[in-house]
UniProtKB/Swiss-Prot annotation:
GO molecular function: translation release factor activity, codon specific
SUPFAM superfamilies: Release factor
SMART domains xref list: PCRF (SM00937)
Gene designation per UniProt: prfA
Modified-residue entries (N5-methylglutamine), positions: 233
Organism: Brevibacillus brevis (strain 47 / JCM 6285 / NBRC 100599)
Transmembrane annotation, as ranges: none
The keyword ATP-binding is annotated on this UniProt entry: no
Keyword rRNA-binding tagged: no
Keywords: Cytoplasm, Methylation, Protein biosynthesis
Described purpose of this protein according to its UniProt entry: Peptide chain release factor 1 directs the termination of translation in response to the peptide chain termination codons UAG and UAA.
Protein name: Peptide chain release factor 1
Family statement drawn from the similarity comment of this UniProt entry: Belongs to the prokaryotic/mitochondrial release factor family.
Length: 358
């Protein structure tokens, strides 16, 4: 482990020096790549340096105990040694996690698709609740949110809503949200007071950059049509809505949120790139996925991952058996406890798998 940490520290210093090189500064692409690499190494190096400092302090404390000390001073040194040893253990555990293979998509922006599934109008209303929850979560994390496509219903729900979240580490925080979300509550329209169960599906895709997924004009077909509002009525007499079809894969994306055809096309292409990136990544990982499923659920939108129970004010994440009795605050975007536990679970499972393969 420590050989790897020394190599990481050496690379960090090399990258830091390169970022001061005038040739690098003048090359925007190279500068961006190196800045990203420096950022990805920084926490590991900072933690490793603190670890080395703590080890040095432990050696000094042990050396002091070999000297002639009065009882009070000896107790002080022993107390400090105990604290330093505990800190050393914490740092070792943290370094093991920091050296785990990183998800290359973690720092990417994301595109999120929410669809009302089983439950009709109630499912569409729940899709709107989830969208609001993610909006609040985005605000708390200083992520920029942009709606790319929406199909609202007459009663304030969404058959489907697609949006992007932009900001550092957006995918690392949102990637565990893919799957089926179940709600149990009494609908406002229910006179008998019976609890209904509905579901909405969420799909989280890392947003692909142009250089990662190239979309050739010859591979796409663009159709234009009049945009429609809730209930399907036409709200626009000009053909500003756009449908982009990727001919080789058959993947289709529609966008009608903007007033101009050009803006709708740009948004549709962003979603298409993300879907193509996901499509190609799944193809590449097909063999590996057959033997090693995702450590925190499959990420399949049909897999039930979480239940939101209104009568009990309860949120349960079924993948890790976590239950919180504070539904209202979670729906207000206070999702950190859920997400942190999912991340911790994934890291624990990764450590186990690495220990078995070592």
């Amino acid at each position: 482990m420590f050989t790897r940490l020394s190599a990481v520290e050496e690379r960090f210093e090399e990258v830091t020096n390169l970022l001061c090189d005038p040739d690098v500064i003048s090359d925007t692409k190279r500068l961006r790549e190196l800045s990203k690499e420096q950022s990805s190494l920084e926490e590991t190096v900072t933690t490793y340096r603190e670890y080395k400092s703590v080890v040095s302090q432990i050696d000094d404390a042990k050396a002091m105990l070999e000297e002639k000390l009065d009882d009070e001073m000896r107790e002080m040194v022993k107390l400090e040694l105990n604290e330093l040893s505990a800190r050393k253990e914490q740092l070792e555990d943290r370094l093991k996690i920091l050296l785990l293979p990183k998800d290359p998509n973690d720092e990417k922006n994301v595109i999120v698709e929410i669809r009302g599934a089983a439950g009709g109008d109630e499912a569409a209303l729940f899709a709107a609740v989830l969208f609001r929850m993610y909006t609040r979560f985005a605000e708390r994390n200083a992520f920029k949110i942009e709606v790319l496509e929406a199909s609202p219903t007459d009663i304030g729900g969404y058959k489907e809503i697609v949006f992007s979240l932009s900001g550092r580490g957006a995918y690392s925080k949102m990637k565990f949200e893919s799957g089926a979300h179940r709600v149990q509550r009494i609908p406002a329209t229910e006179s008998g007071g019976r609890i209904h169960t509905s579901t909405a599906t969420v799909l989280v895709l890392p947003e692909a950059e142009d250089v990662e997924v190239e979309v050739h004009e010859k591979d796409i077909r663009i159709d234009t049509f009049c945009s429609s509002g809730a209930g399907g009525q036409s709200v626009n007499t000009t053909k500003s809505a756009v449908r982009v079809t990727h001919i080789p894969t058959g993947i289709m994306v529609s966008c009608q949120d903007e007033k101009s055809q050009h803006s709708n096309k740009d948004k549709a292409l962003r979603v298409l790139r993300a879907r193509l990136y996901d499509f190609y990544m799944q193809q590449q990982n097909a063999e590996a996925d057959a033997t090693r499923k995702s450590l925190v659920g499959t990420g399949d939108r049909s897999e039930r991952i979480r239940t939101y129970n209104y009568p009990q004010s309860r949120v349960t994440d079924h993948r890790i058996g976590l239950t919180l009795h504070r539904l209202e605050s979670v729906l207000e975007g206070e999702m950190d406890e859920v997400i942190d536990n999912l991340i911790m679970h994934e890291q624990t499972e990764l450590l186990k798998s690495h220990a078995h393969s070592a």
